[in-house]
Amino acid sequence: MTNISNRKDDHIQLALEARHQSQSGSHFDRLTFEHSGLPEQALEDTDIACHFLGRPIAAPFMIGAMTGGCNNGELINQHLAEAAEYCHIPMALGSQRAALEQGLAQNVRRWAPNATILGNLGATQLQQSGLDLAKRAVESVDANALIIHLNPLQ
């Protein structure tokens, strides 16, 4: 396992530890909303389906980029991909850098053959490796689009 994979596994483990969980809560329990229903609109007549990247999706929601390129990330991505497929919503992958550098299989299409999938690379890696890396990222997961994330600390 490489340093990148170890670091990404460490990120997941740190996020799961109790000492990194909020003790104060989110304070959403302090909020109350005034109900302003739409009695003239029946829920069964409401359709939030739309198109994204020219593809039909069930709702204007997307599973955001979470993790990638590490052992613990694969199971997380499997569950997210299965949810994207089941709910007919897009999924953005976490950074593909480690998987591409290590030649690891990226199985997202096995779990979400019909979902709209967005690959993901860092701008720094793209600047260093060029357009070929972007093409490999898209082709390796049969992505419908590619997200370029910015990390100013790199």
Q: What are these language model-derived features?
A:
Residues 1-53, 57:
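An N-cap/entry alpha-helix motif that binds or orients negatively charged groups
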Residues 79, 102-110:
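N-terminal active-site wall of soluble small-molecule enzyme domains
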Residues 81-86, 110-117, 124-154:
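Alpha/beta enzyme core
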Residues 52-99:
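Active-site cofactor/substrate anionic-group-binding motifs, chiefly glycine-
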Residues 64-65, 92-96, 118-122, 147-149:
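A cross-family glycoside hydrolase active-site/sugar-binding cleft signature
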Residues 19-24, 45-55, 72-77, 81-82, ...:
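Short, compositionally biased "basic patch" segments
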